[in-house]
């Protein structure tokens, strides 16, 4: 699987890592992907609306595609800091544009001094089984807004812990 696929395509729960990120971004956000050259064409075909290996990366938050990201985790990424978990560099933020040719060196530099952040990530395919129950719970929050919505005042909920109301 991993030879012809990017780590962000791994499905751990309802969504793949890239789907999970895309669901939590705004339409005004720019998504630029840095992928291995040997899978660049495949990824461009699969994701024609995304910017794959551009010559220049815009300032912003850089997320490792192996991470299981939610909006609260993304909000932890602060200006000009880098973050690692037990699998290595997982995220950083940059205020500057970065050339494609310089990005790998820049990431290595960011990895040398980083803060620890508690983000699950998938290093090996079998890691999915360790985090599957958590990602399913996390993904259900993306699908449903539990008990959010307008109910008629005459409506009475019985066993409301077992009821999902979605907008």
Language model: regions and residue ranges:
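Terminal amphipathic alpha-helical/low-complexity segments used for targeting or macromolecular assembly
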Residues: 1-159
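Hydrophobic face of beta-strands forming the core of extended beta-sheets/solenoids
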Residues: 151, 165-166
